[in-house]
C-alpha cells in the first residue's frame, strides 16, 4: 500500500461570533498549505526517472515539500488557542477547556487511524500490508500533539497576558535534544507501533512526536501573542513582528548552513537528523507564510469567493480525497511514469477538483440544513 509522506491537515475552529472574520486569514493560510500539499504528493507519486533528482526535484519535492506538514502542525497549535478563546467566552473552567482540547486531539488521532484502515481496505486488504495500519502519519501526529499541547496551554494564556513560558522551554528542549535521542534505539519492550510515536527509530515513524510536536507548541505560543494583540487592537503590528522574526530566522539559518555551522551531523544510523537549524528554517518560513496570508487577505478584503480560503475550510476532506486520487488505484498507472510538465498540468486539474469539492462541502453540505459532522468544534465555538 502506497501512502504519502508529506502533509495533511485538521480543520481549525472558526472565530466566535463576537469576532467575525478576525482570523479568516488563517483559512487562507491553511488553503496555501493544501496547495503545497497537492504539489508535493503529486510530484512524488507521478514523476518518473530521471527527473526525481536535480534542482527541479529539490525545489518541488524537498524544499516546498517540507512545508505543508509543518504548516498544518503549527496551525494545530493555533487552533488550540482559538478553541481556548472560545471556551473562555463561554465561561468554561480550566479543566473543561483542557479536557475538551484533549478529546479533540484524540478525535483527530481517531481520524488518522480510520484513514489508515480505509487506505488498507481500498488497496486490497493485503496481509503483507497490515503493518501499514500502524504507520504514524500526519493525522496521528497532529492528534497526539494536540493532546500533549493541551498540557502546556490553558485558559490563563488567553485570559491574561502571561506568556506560555513552559511551552517555549519545552519546544527548545525538543528541538535541541531530538538529534541526540534519535541516536538511541527505540525501547525493545515497547511494541513498534507505539514506539513509532516517539522518535524516528522505526520504519513506521513517519511523523513521530520528536521533533514534530515542537511545531504545534510553537503555533500555540505564537497564537497566544496574536490573541493578546487582538485584545489590544494591535494584531497587524504583532504579525509584522512575527513575520519579520520568521524571515530573519530563516535567512540566518540558511546562511549558517552555507557556512557549515551545524550542531549535529549524520551518522550511519541517522542519515537525516532533526537539526535545530531545520526547525529554525521551517518555523521561520511558516511565520513568514502567516504574515503573507494576513497581508493578502487584508488587501483583498473578506468578501467574495476565495479558492484558498475555501480549501482551508474543508482541509480534512480534501486531504483524504486527494491522497486516494494521487496514490490510490485510480491513478496507479501514472505512478512514477510522467514528465514533470505533465505532472504540473495534472496538479492544476487536481487543485481545481479539490476546490470544487471544498466548495460543495462548505457551501452546500456545510449549510445548517445539511450539517456534516466533520466539524463539531465549529458548532460548539
Annotate each language-model stretch with its function:
Residues 2-381:
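Alpha-helical transmembrane segments and their immediate juxtamembrane cytosolic regions
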Amino acid at each position: 500500500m502506497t501512502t504519502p509522506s508529506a502533509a495533511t491537515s485538521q480543520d481549525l475552529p472558526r472565530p466566535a461570533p463576537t469576532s467575525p472574520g478576525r482570523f479568516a486569514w488563517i483559512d487562507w493560510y491553511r488553503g496555501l498549505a493544501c496547495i503545497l500539499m497537492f504539489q508535493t504528493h503529486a510530484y512524488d507519486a507521478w514523476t518518473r526517472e530521471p527527473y526525481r533528482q536535480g534542482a527541479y526535484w529539490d525545489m518541488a519535492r524537498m524544499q516546498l515539500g517540507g512545508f505543508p506538514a509543518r504548516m498544518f502542525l503549527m496551525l494545530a497549535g493555533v487552533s488550540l488557542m482559538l478553541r481556548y478563546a472560545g471556551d473562555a467566552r463561554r465561561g468554561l473552567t480550566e479543566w473543561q477547556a483542557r479536557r475538551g482540547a484533549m478529546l479533540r486531539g484524540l478525535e483527530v488521532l481517531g481520524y488518522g487511524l480510520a484513514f489508515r484502515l480505509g487506505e488498507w481496505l481500498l488497496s486490497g486488504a493485503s496481509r503483507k500490508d497490515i503493518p501499514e495500519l500502524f504507520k504514524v502519519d500526519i493525522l496521528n501526529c497532529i492528534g497526539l500533539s494536540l493532546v500533549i499541547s493541551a498540557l502546556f496551554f490553558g485558559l490563563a494564556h488567553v485570559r491574561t497576558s502571561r506568556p506560555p513560558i513552559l511551552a517555549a522551554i519545552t519546544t527548545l528542549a525538543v528541538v535541541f535534544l531530538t538529534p541526540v535521542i534519535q541516536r538511541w534505539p527505540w525501547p525493545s519492550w515497547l511494541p513498534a507501533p507505539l514506539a513509532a510515536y516517539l522518535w524516528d527509530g522505526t520504519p513506521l515513524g513517519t511523523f513521530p512526536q520528536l521533533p514534530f510536536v515542537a511545531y504545534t507548541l510553537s503555533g500555540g505560543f505564537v497564537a497566544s501573542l496574536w490573541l493578546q494583540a487582538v485584545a489590544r487592537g494591535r494584531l497587524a503590528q504583532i504579525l509584522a513582528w512575527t513575520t519579520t522574526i520568521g524571515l530573519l530566522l530563516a535567512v540566518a539559518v540558511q546562511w549558517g548552513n552555507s557556512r557549515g555551522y551545524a550542531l549535529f551531523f549524520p551518522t550511519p544510523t541517522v542519515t537525516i537528523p532533526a537539526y535545530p537549524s531545520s526547525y529554525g528554517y521551517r518555523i521561520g518560513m511558516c511565520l513568514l507564510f502567516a504574515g503573507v496570508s494576513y497581508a493578502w487577505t487584508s488587501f483583498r478584503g473578506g468578501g467574495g469567493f476565495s479558492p484558498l480560503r475555501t480549501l482551508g475550510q474543508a482541509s480534512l476532506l480534501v486531504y483524504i480525497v486527494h491522497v486516494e486520487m494521487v496514490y490510490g488505484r485510480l491513478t496507479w498507472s501514472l505512478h512514477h511514469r510522467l514528465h514533470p510538465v505533465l505532472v504540473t498540468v495534472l496538479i492544476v486539474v487536481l487543485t481545481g477538483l479539490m476546490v470544487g469539492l471544498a466548495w460543495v462541502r462548505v457551501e452546500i453540505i456545510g449549510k445548517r440544513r445539511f450539517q456534516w459532522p466533520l466539524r463539531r468544534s465549529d458548532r460548539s465555538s
